[in-house]
């Protein structure tokens, strides 16, 4: 019982530290993207260095931190808008039983970005019937799990919970609700949760 309590306390401290580091990475990414258009290479290098440092730190905790390390890397890739590696890392975190609203929010967000990219590519490749067939293939792979993960993240504390509701409505193709929620989110928190507007 003592060992289990010690592990739980260690994991809680680790998660708190991780949260602070992730907030710093995401703030840097968001701030850089809000500046006048410029080369983001410098900021990307800083974020990658932070990711490497975090990975090294987490490795020192051994088995206890494996899932958290994947989660941290997933969020780092997410901050860099590198969605394929973000998806891989977040899925590995969940397989290692890292749960919680924040993990599901990140996974849902990234799956949604994959869906948008796949739709864009389907339209470029032919449109019409071919794009509709592609949609049937990619919906269960990306869209359905994106909506499910976002819905599981509703307990997460956000500055503007309407952003999450708008994102879910957008992926459910309820565009009127999505726009209303996006408008409400912008009034509450002028800068949204990830520097992305619904539908971008």
Regions found by a protein language model. Name each.
Residues 130-199:
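C-terminal luminal/periplasmic domains and tails of membrane-associated envelope-modifying transferases
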Residues 1-12, 17, 104, 175-179, ...:
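Short intrinsically disordered, low-complexity coil segments enriched in acidic
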Residues 1-147, 155-162:
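Charged/polar helix/coil "stalk" or linker segments at domain boundaries
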